[in-house]
Design a protein with these regions (language model features):
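Membrane transport/envelope proteins' first extracytoplasmic loop
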Residues: 1-70
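Transmembrane helix boundary and interhelical loop/hinge segments in multi-pass membrane proteins
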Residues: 74-90
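Conserved transmembrane alpha-helices of multi-pass membrane proteins
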Residues: 50-67, 139-166
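Small-residue-rich transmembrane alpha-helices
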Residues: 27-41, 75-79, 111-140, 151-177
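Feature of multi-pass inner-membrane transport and sensor proteins
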Residues: 1-19, 83-86, 97, 132-152, ...
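Short alpha-helical segment immediately N-terminal to, or the first helix within
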Residues: 90-91, 104, 143
Length: 191
């Protein structure tokens, strides 16, 4: 059995982990983008004065939400890496150098992060429209129709790329210091 066959078998066996990480990334980018699309929409910025206190409070809430989403992404990545250490330990025990294991892991991580981020950005506009439609059922505000706040999409893409780069670097550093004994010891510890 070659290393590629072992890697494919481990991915199939642990596809739930990849799915959870993918859904976490997609959810984080979707929420950031949808909130930004609504907040920076001309339908909102025309009603709320951009220098007014209500708009500044809304921007502050958006900033806190983005901070929470970044923390959520770090947490999801740490849980994913904790469970990936078993696979990484298998490859290290087979004699693969840590650099090769890191390269293989980064390839998988890049694929998951790219796929999930694109889906999150694409779905943020329909999700923002659904929220807008739901809100207009209860509010009598009908002067404007739904418009896209492109700054929100830009911020979501910026957070997506920044989080990808930081998490990839964090994972690379932790994998380059990986040791089979530490991995075996950490697998017996509880979270």
């Amino acid at each position: 059995m070659t290393l590629n066959e072992i890697a494919k078998k481990l991915i199939r066996q642990n596809k739930g982990r990849y799915l959870i990480l993918s859904l976490s990334i997609c959810f984080a980018i979707l929420m950031t983008g949808a909130y930004g699309v609504l907040l920076f929409s001309p339908a909102i910025t025309d009603v709320l004065m951009t220098d007014g206190s209500t708009y500044l409070i809304a921007l502050g809430m958006y900033g806190i939400t983005v901070l929470g989403i970044v923390v959520f992404l770090f947490y999801a990545n740490s849980i994913f890496m904790k469970f990936q250490m078993g696979e990484i330990g298998i490859f290290l025990s087979l004699g693969m150098p840590p650099k090769a294991v890191t390269k293989m892991h980064n390839k998988q991580f890049d694929l998951v992060f790219t796929f999930s981020g694109v889906i999150g950005v694409v779905l943020s506009i329909p999700f923002a429209f659904a929220v807008w439609s739901f809100l207009t059922l209860f509010l009598s505000y009908t002067d404007h129709t739904f418009t896209i706040g492109w700054q929100g999409i830009f911020i979501a893409i910026l957070i997506w790329i920044s989080a990808w780069g930081i998490l990839r670097l964090k994972n690379t550093i932790s994998l380059s210091k990986a040791d089979v004994i530490k991995i075996l010891h950490s697998s017996s510890e509880n979270e």
